[in-house]
Structures are given as C-alpha cells and as structure tokens.
Amino acid sequence: MNAVEIQGVSQRYGSMTVLHDLNLNLGEGEVLGLFGHNGAGKTTSMKLILGLLSPSEGQVKVLGRAPNDPQVRRQLGYLPENVTFYPQLSGRETLRHFARLKGAALTQVDELLEQVGLAHAADRRVKTYSKGMRQRLGLAQALLGEPRLLLLDEPTVGLDPIATQDLYLLIDRLRQRGTSIILCSHVLPGVEAHINRAAILAKGCLQAVGSLSQLRAEAGLPVRIRASGISERDSWLQRWTDAGHSARGLSESSIEVVAVNGHKLVLLRQLLGEGEPEDIEIHQPSLEDLYRYYMERAGDVRAQEGRL
C-alpha cells in the first residue's frame, strides 16, 4: 500500500486553477522531495494530503484512507514552514502539550528533545529560542507518536549547516525505520543524497517525477569529465574538438570535456588508456541543474534568469 496516492487531482479557487490533473504516489519508507517555485502548487498539495482541502476533481488517499480520517491524523506528523508556539511555555512544556493533544506517550518528550539537540534548553521559555531552535522544536513536535507519514515544509529554514546535516541524518534514520516522508524545500544543495525521488512542480503542473538517475536520463543533460596531470593536453583538446566534443583546458595539465549522448564511458576509456591522468572527476547533473532544466522547459522566467 502506498502512503499517499493522488490521482487526477485538480484544485480550483473560483476561476483560478492552481493544480492541474496531478498524479503522484509516495511509497512506504520512501522520501520524496517536492520542489517548485512559489505558487507552483506545493502548499496546495500538502494541504490536500493533510485533509485541509478537498480536491475539486480527483481523489487523495493517505495510508489507504481519506486524509481527514481520525486514524490517519494520528499517524501523520507535520512541520509547517512557519512554526509558532506559545512563547511563555518552555520547550518541554510545549512538547508535552502537543503530546497530550496527539495522544502520544509523554515519555517520548525527553527522547525527542535529545534527538533534535534541544535537551540543554528544554526548560527555557520558547520566547528565548532562536529561529533554528524553534524549527527543531517544530520537528520534535512532528515526530510525536512515531508517525508513519511525515510532511516537512521547508525544514531547514533557520538551521545552521551542522543542524541541517543532523536533520538529513535523522531523515535517513526515519526512512530506514519505514517512515514515509515528503520534504518540500527551496534549498536544493544537500538534499539529493537523502531523497529517493524528486517531484518538480511548475505552474500547478507536475513537470517531472522520478529518481535522480531517471531524471538525468530523461533530461539528457551533459556529464562533465575533468582530468588533471594529463600528458599532451593540447593534443587531447584537438582530438576531442575534432570529434565534435566540447572541451577546454583548465590549466597546463588539466582539461574538461563535456560528455553527451552516452559518450561518458568512451571518453573515460580513452583517458584512462592513453592519457595517464593523475586524477579524474566526474560531475553529474545536480538536482539544481535538473530543477533549472524543467523550470526552463515549463517557461518559468525565474529559472531562465538564474533565480531559484
């Protein structure tokens, strides 16, 4: 059974359609990255899964049931983009309050505070917390009750690099335990190693969904090969240019060649067999490259101007 099934869903507000025939599934124990510009339909999709909206057309199933089913809500955790708590309560009091509301065991509170790195500040009032600390408290709240499905909306907002890496490691552990996760983010660097698939929305339409290897194959973006310590650099540049490849020198003994149309292995064999390089680096298209490609294909001006 899929954790989430969205079938033929369109969402309208009056005469405005904000989602167009969306079909998207989330498997059990899968992490799906949901990406798109502001107004792409990410928030609407999250609200449909949370049961806060009913689709104008189509069907949404969460854990095999309607999203607003009480049994579903007890098994769902949600971290909103903007986290707000009672400022006069301590971190521990806040988490105990939410545990009671959710029917979760109070014994989880201290464990979760430790898990998100707030044990040292558990008895401080939330009004003294930094934005990053409030974000981590929000994550602890979302993890109450050991949810089967976790929705994370911009979870790295306000986190420093170390806290961000800790969050991704926590996501990895949750995935290993079988938790299904939808991670909605504008911050693309660092995400790709921690998701199973990416879904890219633009203008209310699903532009692409799949693993990064599937999206790379579909997009056909080039792979860049860099070799350093190579002998006869100029002859290699001439050879590849004559063969129709895009190549350039990076220094007196290093070069870069762009591999397109499945030529990566051919170029690597040539380099390793004849060039005797000291080092080779292979640069696959990143999640940012793929995002930009699909945004430009959809005609999103911000991507074309170089802004995510």
Curated annotation (Swiss-Prot):
GO cellular component: plasma membrane
Compartments, as annotated in UniProt: Cell inner membrane
Coiled-coil residues: none
GO molecular function, one term: ATP hydrolysis activity
pH-activity relationship: Optimum pH is 8.0-8.5.
Membrane topology according to the record: Peripheral membrane protein
Main location: membrane
Alphabetical keyword list: ATP-binding, Cell inner membrane, Cell membrane, Hydrolase, Membrane, Nucleotide-binding, Transport
Regulation: Inhibited by AMP-PNP. Partially inhibited by N-ethylmaleimide, orthovanadate and NaN(3).
Induction: Induced in response to denitrifying conditions. Activation requires NosR and DnrD regulators.
Residues the record lists as binding ATP: 36-43
Pfam families in alphabetical order: ABC_tran
Limits of the ABC transporter domain: 4-228
Domain of life: Bacteria
SUPFAM superfamilies: P-loop containing nucleoside triphosphate hydrolases
PANTHER family xrefs: ABC TRANSPORTER ATP-BINDING PROTEIN ALBC-RELATED (PTHR42939:SF1)
Function: Required for the assembly of the copper chromophores of nitrous oxide reductase. Has ATPase activity. Could be part of the ABC transporter complex NosDFY.
Subunit structure, interactors included: The complex may be composed of an ATP-binding protein (NosF), a transmembrane protein (NosY) and a solute-binding protein (NosD).
Sequence similarity: Belongs to the ABC transporter superfamily.
Protein name per Swiss-Prot or TrEMBL: Probable ABC transporter ATP-binding protein NosF
Organism of this sequence: Stutzerimonas stutzeri (Pseudomonas stutzeri)
